[in-house]
């Protein structure tokens, strides 16, 4: 993959299908919560796909993200989305992404977690009731299912574990309420989980193998999707918005074994993984058959990601320093 510039280019590269979808959008796109892990890359991908105007909104407590977005051609607005006056002052647009969310550090900050994950999305949908809205939620709203299964489907019952997951389900319920009340077309996207070379479960496992650290097998299976694929899918979702709100799982097609990831990484790195514990019979997994049926297959699969990741780690590539906590079964992050 090379350096971070090459990584960013790959993550923000629009597919032909994305270019076609963006060409059909007849107005400005607003990205709320554009300063997180996915926001800056989504904004750049939309611009590269030909979007005439993309406005990125965040508190931008880290000026690096705002500078980056200004450089790639976005219009940036610094705003606290929990401030009603600030939210109402944002421009009227026909297309909105809601990416704002609070996961890591949520334990001990429960009030902020619920405000960000539940109250804020509902207020955003109310504010943009005349727009089409892609709302990014989480697969954590589902219960654990058998590791041998294909994962939870969109129509399956939810049963969130822990306050983070509960707050995400709360956000979904209030967004659905606002969508139904105002006839606002929305798609709620349940992500399990975006991965790139500086962050993600594959990154965590490969890094631990390389450094000789223990790898906990208690959460023995997981889904991952290359972040570039996730962003391309999201850029094509506005036609899928509906009222009542539609729901779509966003993840890769493979159920990955943490043990197998570690063992394959060990072979490629020439190191023996240090595995501890045993796989539980259940894991947090999502079924993406509906996604593939509507929007097609991912472009990047696990084997390709693993090869890139091993090279990245061996060459000392930078990490975001944000462990996923994939092994946690308590729902506390």
Regions flagged by a language model, labelled:
Residues 31-47:
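N-terminal Rossmann NAD(P)H-binding glycine-rich loop of SDR-like oxidoreductase domains
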Residues 51-64:
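Conserved glycine-rich Rossmann-like NAD(P)H-binding loop of the short-chain dehydrogenase/reductase
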Residues 213, 220, 233-290, 330-331:
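Mid/C-terminal beta-alpha module of Rossmann-like enzyme folds, strongest
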Residues 28, 95-98, 103, 119-163:
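Conserved Rossmann-fold NAD(P)-dependent oxidoreductase catalytic core, especially the SDR/UDP-sugar
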Residues 149, 169, 173-229, 265:
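NAD(P)-dependent short-chain dehydrogenase/reductase
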Residues 40, 63, 68, 74-116:
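NAD(P)H-binding glycine-rich loop region in Rossmannoid oxidoreductase-like domains
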Residues 114, 118, 150-156, 160-172, ...:
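Short-chain dehydrogenase/reductase
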Residues 2-22, 28, 302-333:
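Amphipathic terminal alpha-helices
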């Amino acid at each position: 993959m090379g350096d971070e510039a090459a990584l960013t280019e790959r993550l923000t590269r629009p597919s032909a299908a994305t270019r076609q979808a963006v060409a059909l959008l007849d107005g400005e796109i607003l990205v709320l919560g554009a300063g997180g892990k996915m926001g800056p890359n989504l904004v750049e991908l939309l611009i590269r796909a030909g979007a005439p105007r993309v406005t990125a909104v965040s508190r931008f407590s880290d000026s690096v993200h705002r500078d980056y977005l200004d450089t790639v051609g976005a219009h940036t607005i610094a705003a606290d989305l929990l401030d009603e006056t600030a939210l109402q002052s944002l421009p009227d647009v026909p297309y909105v992404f809601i990416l704002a969310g609070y996961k890591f550090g949520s334990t001990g900050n429960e009030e902020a977690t619920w405000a960000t994950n539940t109250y804020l999305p509902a207020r955003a949908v109310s504010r943009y009731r005349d727009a089409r809205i892609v709302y990014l939620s989480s697969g954590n709203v589902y219960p654990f299912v058998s590791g041998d299964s294909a994962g939870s489907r969109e129509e399956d019952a939810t049963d969130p574990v822990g306050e983070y997951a509960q707050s995400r389900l709360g956000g979904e319920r209030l967004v659905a309420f606002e969508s139904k009340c105002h006839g606002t077309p929305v798609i709620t996207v349940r992500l399990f989980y975006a991965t790139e070379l500086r962050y993600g479960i594959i990154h965590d496992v490969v890094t631990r193998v390389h450094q000789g650290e223990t790898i906990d097998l208690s959460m023995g299976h997981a889904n991952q999707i290359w972040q570039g694929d996730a962003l391309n899918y999201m850029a094509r979702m506005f036609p899928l918005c509906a009222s009542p709100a539609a729901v779509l799982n966003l993840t890769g097609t493979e159920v990955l074994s943490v043990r197998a990831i570690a063992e394959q990484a060990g072979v490629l790195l020439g190191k023996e993984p240090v595995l501890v514990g045993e796989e539980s019979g259940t894991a947090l997994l999502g079924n993406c058959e509906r996604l593939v049926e509507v929007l097609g297959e991912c472009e990047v699969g696990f084997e390709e990601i693993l090869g890139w990741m091993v090279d990245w780690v061996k060459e000392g590539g930078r990490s975001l320093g944000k462990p996923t906590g994939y092994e946690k079964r308590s729902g506390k992050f």
